[in-house]
């Protein structure tokens, strides 16, 4: 277990010495611990608690009711325990994924662009509470990325936020079942997150472990098919338990920040162990636009740019090979609708 650095997030970010120093401290925390915390105000804590309450209510329902909320159009919706796969092994988490809520009348849906469609909400209260929580985290994400840009001494503090305009922000609402003994009880296998910035909330049960940067340890580039991070170092020493704390959120970098910074910031490996108590968590992903092409901050002709939407689609197809959404993409050849590198030239 490690004591995390905790920050207060300013309401507005400016290119001032104070905010540059704050950004530098955040970068240092990531390069040391792989993760840091930000504090919540009382109203923000209430918004978080209301989202957790809706999560508990939804997951308390029977499987038949929950499993109605799936979609062939989008990866939004219910994911049963053992449906998600990490490193070829089923995870025990039960999930409701919330991707951008795009109506059937939208041109992207009519054109059968992969992953686009309405969220199969379980109800209005769930929808409203989750959207309120995600909206709050969206404002956090923009400010955090501005601070990180300042902390990296970039000339423009909006270097990252230009990528996230109308971003493909999404959230995984998670429930972890109980086990007789929490010793080596896998909830989610070791992995890094495929996106840009992760902001997470957890209840008081505990189960999250992260792997900080370790000198001399090779870290894979998860965006490359030959360098998946799934399962890497899962059974090695060096993992830190993240103790649940009240009125805070945890923040860590995903694969795209590692890609953008040429490995100066490493995507944080993490895993979840089950507990003898039921556990709830929510992980929000602050992401580039679906159509964004992402290139390293320092130009490198040897490094190909990444199309975010193609990357997202490939990652979800890998995690959910048997899901109706994946089958529809494969059976209808919908990957052909996504850009290829040749189209960038």
UniProtKB/Swiss-Prot annotation:
It comes from the Bacteria. Pathway: Alkene biosynthesis; ethylene biosynthesis via 2-oxoglutarate. One of its GO terms (biological process) is ethylene biosynthetic process. The keyword Oxidoreductase applies. Belongs to the iron/ascorbate-dependent oxidoreductase family. Residues 167-288 form the Fe2OG dioxygenase domain. GO terms for molecular function: 2-oxoglutarate oxygenase/decarboxylase (ethylene-forming) activity; dioxygenase activity; metal ion binding. A dual-circuit mechanism has been proposed in P.syringae pv phaseolicola for the complete reaction, in which the binding of L-arginine and 2-oxoglutarate in a Schiff-base structure generates a common intermediate for the two reactions. It holds the Pfam family 2OG-FeII_Oxy. The keyword Magnesium does not apply. Keywords: Dioxygenase, Ethylene biosynthesis, Iron, Metal-binding, Oxidoreductase, Plasmid. This is 2-oxoglutarate-dependent ethylene/succinate-forming enzyme. It catalyses: 2-oxoglutarate + O2 + 2 H(+) = ethene + 3 CO2 + H2O; L-arginine + 2-oxoglutarate + O2 = guanidine + L-glutamate 5-semialdehyde + succinate + CO2. Gene3D superfamilies: B-lactam Antibiotic, Isopenicillin N Synthase, Chain. Monomer. Its EC number is 1.13.12.19, 1.14.20.7. It comes from Ralstonia nicotianae (strain ATCC BAA-1114 / GMI1000). Simultaneously catalyzes two reactions, namely formation of ethylene and of succinate from 2-oxoglutarate. InterPro entries: DIOX_N (IPR026992), IPNS-like_FE2OG_OXY (IPR044861), IPNS-like_sf (IPR027443), Iron_ascorbate_oxido_reductase (IPR050231), Oxoglu/Fe-dep_dioxygenase_dom (IPR005123).
């Amino acid at each position: 277990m490690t004591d995390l650095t905790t920050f207060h997030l300013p309401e507005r970010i400016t290119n001032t010495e104070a905010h540059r120093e704050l950004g530098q401290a955040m970068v240092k925390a990531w390069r040391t611990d792989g993760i840091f915390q930000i504090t919540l105000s009382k109203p923000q804590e209430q918004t978080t608690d209301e989202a957790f309450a809706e999560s508990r209510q939804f997951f308390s329902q029977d499987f038949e009711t929950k499993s109605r909320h799936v979609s062939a159009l989008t990866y939004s919706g219910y994911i049963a325990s053992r449906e998600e796969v990490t490193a070829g092994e089923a995870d025990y988490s039960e999930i409701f994924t919330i991707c951008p809520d795009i109506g059937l009348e939208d041109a992207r849906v009519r054109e059968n662009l992969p992953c686009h469609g309405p969220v199969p909400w379980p109800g209005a209260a769930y929808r409203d509470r989750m959207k309120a929580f995600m909206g709050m985290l969206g404002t956090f994400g923009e400010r955090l990325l501005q601070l990180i840009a300042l902390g990296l001494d970039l000339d423009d503090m909006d270097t990252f936020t230009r990528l996230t305009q109308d971003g493909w922000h999404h959230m995984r609402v998670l429930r972890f079942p109980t086990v007789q003994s929490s010793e080596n009880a896998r909830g989610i296998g070791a992995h890094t997150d495929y996106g840009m910035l992760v902001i997470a909330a957890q209840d008081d049960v505990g189960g999250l472990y992260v792997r900080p940067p370790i000198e001399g340890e090779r870290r894979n580039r998860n965006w490359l098919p030959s360098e998946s991070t799934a399962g890497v170092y899962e059974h090695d020493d060096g993992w830190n338990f993240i103790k649940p704390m009240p009125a805070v959120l945890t923040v860590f970098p995903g694969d795209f920040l590692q890609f953008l910074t040429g490995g100066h910031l490493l995507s944080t490996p993490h895993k979840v162990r089950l507990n003898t108590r039921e556990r709830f968590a929510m992980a929000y992903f602050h992401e580039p636009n679906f159509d964004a092409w992402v290139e390293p901050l320092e130009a490198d002709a040897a490094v190909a740019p990444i199309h975010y939407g193609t990357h997202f689609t490939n990652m979800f197809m890998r995690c959910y090979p048997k899901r109706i959404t994946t089958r529809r993409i494969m059976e209808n050849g919908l990957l052909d609708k996504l850009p290829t590198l040749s189209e960038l030239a």
